[in-house]
């Protein structure tokens, strides 16, 4: 619920101040809702990242047609997500312009790209997996 200035540079241990735009409980509730998107039955199960809980949103839009209105066969597909959902370290948006083939929905087209890229980014950043926390059960682990 806090907006912080974006940067590509790591500033050591310097604390970056932001401004609160959502109260903490509302932000937590929205993140919890967005985790359902990548769980079984959600619209972006292919965006899931092994051993991490992901929160995200899919998007699919028709592109504007040259002759006016919207094209029936040209789309933009996207998936925007963050991980780990309970304490986000990384946020990412994957957009695919005019996906080819029969699938054009964000969860099916951009979701797998998000999954692979986020998985590598979390590994490179040494973000501890959720699976190592004893009180967290991931959808991929099933019920014990």
Model segments located where?
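Conserved active-site-proximal loop/helix segments of enzymes involved in bacterial cell-wall
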Residues: 1-51, 101-104, 124-144
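Generic beta-strand/beta-sheet core signal
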Residues: 6-7, 55, 59, 83, ...
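Short alpha-helix boundary/capping segments
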Residues: 22, 72, 102-113
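Extracytoplasmic/secreted envelope proteins and their assembly/folding machinery
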Residues: 27-34, 77, 111, 115-119
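Residue-level preference for non-acidic, small/hydrophobic
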Residues: 30, 57-59, 80, 92, ...
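Solvent-exposed loop/turn segments at secondary-structure junctions
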Residues: 37, 60-62, 85-87, 97-101
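Short, Gly/Ser/Thr-enriched beta-strand-loop segments that form substrate-interacting elements
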Residues: 50-83
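Short, well-ordered beta-strand elements
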Residues: 79-80, 88-104
């Amino acid at each position: 619920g806090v907006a912080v200035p974006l940067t590509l540079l790591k500033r050591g241990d310097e604390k970056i101040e932001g401004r609160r735009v959502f109260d903490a409980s509302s932000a937590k509730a929205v993140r919890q809702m967005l985790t359902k998107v990548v769980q079984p039955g959600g619209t972006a199960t292919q965006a899931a990242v092994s051993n991490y809980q992901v929160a995200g949103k899919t998007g699919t839009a028709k592109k504007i047609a040259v002759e006016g209105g919207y094209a029936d066969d040209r789309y933009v597909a996207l998936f925007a997500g963050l991980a780990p959902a309970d304490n986000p370290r990384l946020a990412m948006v994957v957009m695919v312009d005019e996906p080819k083939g029969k699938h054009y929905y964000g969860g099916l087209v951009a979701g797998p790209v998000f999954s692979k890229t986020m998985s590598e980014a979390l590994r490179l950043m040494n973000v501890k997996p959720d699976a190592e926390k004893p009180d967290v059960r991931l959808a991929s682990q099933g019920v014990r």
